[in-house]
């Protein structure tokens, strides 16, 4: 039985890579050529022609009033926080189970990140934990819509109103996902999106900031464009020290066609997710995270989250099962995707470099500063992340995924 598993020398179920990356049609390539031949590749004049076209298209699809394309998603978060009036020393509450860029964007503006635990059902930020963490220094809440889940916006917005806080939605995973029929990113005071290379929409790198308030938008435009305060975005008082965080015309050109193709690809992913979930449920040990919350009116499938149950796999740990699946040609991720943020080696914050944290954390932020048991359990034991590249191809791809899972399940004793 041992030899059947590819991990021990058997033949893998799949040897071909899954399809990945954007699909460029001839019209998309023409648009890119037009930019290359225009002689105007960068962000000046700001916003440049293709940037304007994409911003109008993306905001129109989201139902957002204002938006600006920027260099990347972390930049989008930092710019949004400053544009919303978060200052040095202000506390910003966010989730302990996210990519480090969410919290790093807070540190980068000399504000103080406060990490709280996640809801055990959705693995998004727990509203009760948010409210418990509020202090007189709290200025903002940054919920993350994680994978195919959406944070409880009703509860979070109610808390924000009660305590006079701003809400910045981190929608890096959630392009065009909907809460109560409205796209995420448009419920809070601002929303941030990512177009990094792994995302369902990508320009290699890139980010987008949306807001419903003109002054917030004008401040963001100025911050992105080196602090310039030019006609069209000069309604706010004073000046702000900005950076060059402009996106290029090529980034905008890459993205326009992906908005046009989104619904077709989304339908394919949705169908494949349904097939995968049905098959994994039949095999056992992989339960979809979350529930059928009627307030979630459209999910996105950048990643799909499952909860692993070792009791249905003869007590074998998730990581060992995922190792065997990888050998079969199917990459599901666990701790390699997101460790809990307070234990992430990439998120190293000391008062020597970022003095505003000293009052709350002393010389450095460390694991001892946080109690995040749900985040730790999800990261180290339960979470299984399935990337959209496994879900955008034909249904036969899902058949092979399920074949691999079933094969590993048949041979689970060999993994003990």
From Swiss-Prot:
It is an enzyme of class 2 (transferase). GO terms for molecular function: pyridoxal phosphate binding; transaminase activity. One of its GO terms (biological process) is antibiotic biosynthetic process. The modification N6-(pyridoxal phosphate)lysine is found at residue 199. Its cofactor is pyridoxal 5'-phosphate. Keywords: Aminotransferase, Antibiotic biosynthesis, Pyridoxal phosphate, Transferase. It holds the Pfam family DegT_DnrJ_EryC1. Transmembrane segments: none annotated. Its EC number is 2.6.1.101. It comes from the Bacteria. Pathway: Metabolic intermediate biosynthesis; 2-deoxystreptamine biosynthesis; 2-deoxystreptamine from D-glucose 6-phosphate: step 4/4; Antibiotic biosynthesis; tobramycin biosynthesis. The keyword Zinc-finger does not apply. InterPro entries: DegT/StrS_aminotransferase, PyrdxlP-dep_Trfase, PyrdxlP-dep_Trfase_major, PyrdxlP-dep_Trfase_small. It catalyses: 3-amino-2,3-dideoxy-scyllo-inosose + L-glutamine = 2-deoxystreptamine + 2-oxoglutaramate. SUPFAM superfamilies: PLP-dependent transferases. Catalyzes the transamination of 3-amino-2,3-dideoxy-scyllo-inosose (amino-DOI) into 2-deoxystreptamine (DOS). PANTHER family: DTDP-4-AMINO-4,6-DIDEOXYGALACTOSE TRANSAMINASE, TRANSAMINASE. Belongs to the DegT/DnrJ/EryC1 family. L-glutamine:2-deoxy-scyllo-inosose/scyllo-inosose aminotransferase subfamily. This is Putative L-glutamine:3-amino-2,3-dideoxy-scyllo-inosose aminotransferase. It comes from Streptoalloteichus tenebrarius (strain ATCC 17920 / DSM 40477 / JCM 4838 / CBS 697.72 / NBRC 16177 / NCIMB 11028 / NRRL B-12390 / A12253. 1 / ISP 5477). The gene is tobS2.
């Amino acid at each position: 039985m041992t030899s059947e598993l590819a991990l021990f020398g058997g033949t893998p179920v799949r040897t071909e890579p899954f399809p990945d990356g954007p699909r460029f049609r001839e019209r998309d390539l023409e648009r890119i050529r037009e930019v290359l031949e225009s002689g105007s590749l960068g962000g000046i004049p700001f916003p440049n022609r293709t940037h304007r076209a994409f911003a109008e298209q993306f905001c129109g699809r989201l139902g957002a009033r204002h938006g600006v394309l920027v260099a990347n998603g972390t930049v989008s978060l930092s710019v949004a926080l400053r544009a919303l009036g978060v200052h040095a020393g202000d506390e910003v509450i966010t989730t302990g189970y996210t990519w480090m860029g969410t919290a790093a964007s807070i540190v980068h503006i000399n504000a103080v990140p406060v990490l709280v635990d996640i809801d055990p059902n959705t693995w998004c930020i727990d509203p009760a934990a948010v409210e418990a963490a509020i202090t007189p220094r709290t200025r903002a809440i940054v919920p993350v819509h994680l994978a195919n889940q959406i944070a409880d916006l009703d509860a979070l917005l109610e808390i924000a109103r009660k305590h006079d806080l701003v809400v910045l939605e981190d929608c890096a995973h959630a392009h065009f996902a909907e809460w109560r029929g409205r796209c995420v990113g448009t419920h809070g005071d601002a929303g941030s999106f990512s177009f990094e290379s792994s995302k369902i929409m990508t320009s290699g790198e890139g980010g987008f900031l949306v807001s419903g308030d003109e002054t917030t938008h004008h401040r963001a435009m100025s911050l992105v464009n080196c602090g310039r305060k030019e006609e069209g975005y000069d309604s706010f008082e004073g000046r702000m020290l900005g950076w060059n965080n402009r996106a290029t015309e090529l980034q905008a050109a890459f993205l326009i066609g992906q908005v046009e193709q989104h619904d077709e690809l989304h339908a394919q992913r949705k169908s494949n997710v349904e097939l995968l979930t049905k098959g994994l449920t039949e095999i056992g040990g992989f339960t979809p995270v979350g529930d059928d919350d009627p307030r979630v009116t459209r999910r996105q499938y950048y990643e799909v989250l499952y909860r692993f149950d070792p009791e249905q796999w003869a007590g074998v740990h998730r990581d060992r099962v995922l190792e065997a699946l990888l050998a079969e040609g199917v990459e599901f991720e666990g701790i390699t995707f997101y460790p809990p943020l307070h234990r992430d080696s990439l998120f190293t914050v000391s008062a020597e470099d970022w003095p505003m944290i000293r009052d709350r954390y002393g010389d450095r932020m460390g694991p001892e500063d946080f109690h995040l048991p749900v985040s730790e359990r999800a990261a180290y034991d339960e979470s299984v992340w399935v990337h959209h590249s496994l879900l955008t191809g034909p249904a036969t791809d899902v058949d092979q995924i399920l074949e691999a899972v079933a094969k590993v399940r048949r041979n689970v004793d060999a993994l003990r």
